[in-house]
A protein has these predicted regions:
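Conserved class I S-adenosyl-L-methionine
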Residues: 172-176
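Flexible, gly/ser-rich surface segments that form the specificity/activation loops bordering the active-site cleft
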Residues: 125-130
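Short, compositionally biased
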Residues: 131-145
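Short glycine/threonine/proline-enriched tight-turn/helix- or strand-capping micro-motif at secondary-structure
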Residues: 16-23
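A glycine-rich, Thr/Ser-enriched phosphate-binding loop motif common to dinucleotide/cofactor-binding enzymes
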Residues: 98-100, 124, 142-167, 177-180
Length: 180
């Protein structure tokens, strides 16, 4: 393995603290792409929202995610207040990796058809030196596309999925709000 420890950007949802941490490097796995990062893009809208969410109070978090708040109330009714608070604290104590606009070079293709070591790929993987990428959310990058330009692919995919959900027709006009 070329890397034993790598650096990754994570956020602690309980405190809102974002930091660069040393984590064990993923190893080769059948059905996964092991990718060394060459570029990673920060989505100002989505990632800023996540950082601000993490910095918010418990009340703020509940207001932003009413469906999870309802699940918490149901858990209190079924398991009690102490067990529910313990579960929430445990969940908020787990750092989450940030990022989803990733470009890199395949180190190990994990026997995934259509990919080989050395391929340049774009994926929805987090900001880290080496990632284990899902082939379902990865694509080979054409030679004519730079790594820098390829990092924008996941942002375009999010917009495209929005259009699919909207079921917009080519003749229709749509308004995009949020820009991130």
């Amino acid at each position: 393995r070329p890397f034993l420890i790598l650096r990754q950007i994570v956020q602690h949802l309980g405190s809102g603290r974002t930091e660069l941490v040393d984590v064990p490097a993923p190893g080769p796995r059948r059905g996964r792409l092991l990718v060394r990062t060459t570029r990673s893009l920060v989505s100002l809208g989505t990632e800023r929202m996540l950082v601000e969410f993490g910095r918010g109070s418990w009340l703020s978090k509940a207001r932003q995610q009413p469906e999870k708040f309802r699940a918490v109330l149901a858990k209190i009714r079924s398991e009690g207040l102490f067990a529910t608070v313990s579960a929430i604290r445990s969940k908020l104590a787990q750092p989450i990796p940030l990022g989803y606009c990733h470009v890199g070079q395949v180190l190990d293709a994990g026997e995934v058809p259509g990919f080989a070591a050395g391929d340049r790929v774009v994926s929805n993987s987090p900001h880290a030196e080496v990632v284990s990428a899902s082939p379902a959310f990865a694509a080979r990058i054409p030679e004519s596309v730079s790594d820098e330009h390829a990092t924008f692919t996941p942002l375009a995919a999010v917009a495209l999925q929005g259009l699919r959900l909207l079921d917009a027709k080519p003749s229709e006009t749509v308004v995009v709000m949020g820009l991130g």
